[in-house]
């Protein structure tokens, strides 16, 4: 049985809050991004990546545009060590990319880390120790003073070994479990580390404040970051970094509000992979900025390709509703949504506006490698006439008359409902043609001839009706009127033509014409037919006969 009384809030609000960050509307520039896919992401996989897979993933991150990439914890295992050496010895690290390695604040681990870095042109050495109340009391059984000494001893050793090792080394410190640490104590630990390192304008250090486990609402984390930023020593020479996880589902919100509160840098992963519920998803963060007109400095212009590579290398699946990247994130099944999108697309084609503003689509799918035809309007039993007509128009060139769209919509939706499945564009085309186009039962057109008379047009129609040859004659003001009068003269049917429309089929055809006819019975019912033929006159006759044949059904 659930019992909320066993829980209490485990986070710490700052002793003072200015909330200056709440006055900012949006993030105006991209932070420094650091991918931790090859460490945090990899350690969370059921089957960690092999050496070759890691190398491929590293190249993938470089292609996306990451300039800082955490490549592992080289002292943790031979695999991690070998991967780092492979990158260095095979010169796989571009000059504009800085690798990052993780180490605990323990002497033998730090020494092993620097051994692994020999030959690296430039690297961030990321040292951490846990500072939270729970970790101090339950795991390490150490006092605040003892935990601070672990941090400062690690910082001193880092500085000494960096001086003794060839290469350009930058330092990063994380008070792990920061959000479960008393804020002023976390500040004291970070300032003590900074006093050891003495950062300068030409040699800045990184202080990383992780949401190791989410404990609060996002505004609390933002207030913590703002307090740390305002009270931290050497602030102008410190890169203030974030490392949010997603335990409460607020990883993106934590990050965005903390950036408003003064942070400069973000550590995260593609698609939010990571321990438990994952790290913050950098793709979502970057594209959220992009939709506000801010260049995220990362290239996500081919998300389908990136998704396939990620799923293959990690053996993980991207959730269908994952923001921006999921298979269904642009899909509209609802009839009203489809209608609004279709009208928005037509409006954009007509007006050519400078900025993107389409209902239900916060980003242009083309910008991230998606297609309107296959990704946006999706048809099932919940769809509407606008969406179905949009699919037929965009994929196959059918400009269905407005009054006919409702009938076609109900027909297609009924098929989807009976099959209990989504209909792809080719399924929709098949239904449309089978129900409306060139219907030849019971009447099948063989030939039609017209003669211009002073009194109008005379038509001679050669048909097969239920397999029996027939020859009908009729007069009218125009060709279609003459054919209609001939059909009614030789049958018991009574109707009037209420809609006629024609156009060239310019998608996937050889100069064919398409016509649509709606006929209304005396009781007010309207039945629709369509005809397709190389000759527009024949197409219009076929459309009329299709509609008349459907009256008999």
Segments (PLM) and residue ranges:
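Positively charged, aromatic-enriched nucleic acid-contacting surfaces
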Residues: 459-463, 505-528
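Short beta-alpha connecting loops at secondary-structure transitions
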Residues: 209-211, 239, 267-275, 287-299, ...
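Alpha/beta enzyme core
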Residues: 4-7, 33, 44-68, 84-90, ...
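A mid-to-C-terminal "edge-of-domain" accessory segment
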Residues: 2-39, 293-473, 509-512
């Amino acid at each position: 049985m659930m019992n909320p009384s066993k829980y209490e809030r485990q986070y710490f609000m700052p002793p003072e809050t200015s909330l200056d960050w709440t006055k900012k509307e949006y993030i105006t520039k991209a932070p420094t991004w650091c991918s931790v896919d090859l460490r945090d992401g990899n350690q969370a996989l059921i089957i960690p990546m092999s050496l070759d897979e890691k190398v491929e993933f590293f190249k993938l991150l470089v292609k996306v545009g990451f300039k800082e990439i955490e490549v592992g914890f080289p002292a943790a295992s031979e695999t991690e060590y070998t991967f780092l050496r492979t990158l260095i010895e095979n010169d796989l690290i571009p000059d504009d990319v800085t690798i990052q390695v993780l180490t605990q604040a323990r002497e033998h681990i730090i020494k092993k880390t620097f051994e692994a870095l020999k030959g690296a042109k430039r690297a961030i050495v990321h040292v951490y120790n846990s500072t939270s109340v729970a970790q101090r009391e339950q795991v390490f059984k150490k006092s605040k003073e003892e935990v601070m000494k672990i941090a400062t001893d690690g910082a001193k050793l880092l500085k000494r070994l960096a001086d003794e090792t060839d290469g350009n080394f930058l330092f990063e410190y994380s008070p792990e479990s920061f959000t479960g640490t008393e804020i002023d104590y976390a500040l004291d630990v970070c300032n003590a580390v900074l006093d050891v390192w003495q950062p300068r304008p030409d040699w800045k250090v990184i202080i990383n404040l992780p949401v190791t486990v989410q404990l609060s609402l996002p505004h609390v984390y933002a207030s913590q970051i703002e307090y740390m930023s305002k009270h931290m020593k050497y602030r102008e020479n410190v890169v203030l970094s974030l490392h949010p996880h997603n335990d409460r589902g607020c990883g993106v919100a934590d990050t965005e509000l903390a950036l408003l509160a003064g942070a400069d840098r973000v550590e995260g992963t593609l698609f939010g992979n990571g321990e438990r519920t994952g790290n913050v998803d950098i793709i979502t963060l970057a594209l959220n900025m992009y939709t506000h007109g801010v260049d995220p400095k990362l290239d996500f212009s081919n998300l389908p390709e990136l998704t396939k590579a990620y799923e293959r290398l990690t053996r993980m699946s991207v959730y269908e509703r994952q923001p921006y990247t999921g298979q269904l994130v642009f899909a509209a099944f609802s009839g009203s949504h489809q209608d609004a999108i279709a009208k928005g697309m037509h409006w954009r084609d007509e007006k050519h506006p400078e900025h993107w503003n389409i209902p239900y689509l916060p980003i242009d799918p083309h910008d991230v490698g998606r297609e309107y035809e296959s990704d946006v309007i999706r048809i099932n039993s919940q769809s509407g006439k606008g969406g179905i007509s949009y699919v037929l128009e965009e994929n196959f060139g059918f400009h269905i008359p407005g009054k006919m769209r409702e009938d076609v919509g109900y027909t297609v939706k009924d098929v989807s409902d009976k099959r209990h499945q989504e209909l792809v564009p080719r399924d929709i085309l098949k239904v449309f043609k089978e129900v409306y186009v060139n219907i030849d039962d019971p009447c099948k057109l063989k030939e039609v001839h017209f003669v211009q008379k002073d009194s109008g047009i005379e038509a001679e129609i050669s048909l097969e009706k239920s397999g029996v040859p027939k020859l009908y004659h009729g007069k009218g003001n125009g060709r279609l009127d003459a054919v209609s009068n001939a059909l009614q003269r030789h049958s018991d049917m009574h109707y009037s033509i209420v809609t006629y429309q024609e156009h060239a089929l310019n998608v996937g055809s050889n100069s064919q014409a398409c016509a649509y006819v709606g006929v209304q019975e005396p009781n007010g019912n309207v039945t629709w037919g369509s005809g397709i033929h190389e000759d527009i006159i024949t197409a219009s006759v076929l459309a009329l006969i299709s509609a008349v044949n459907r009256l008999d059904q």
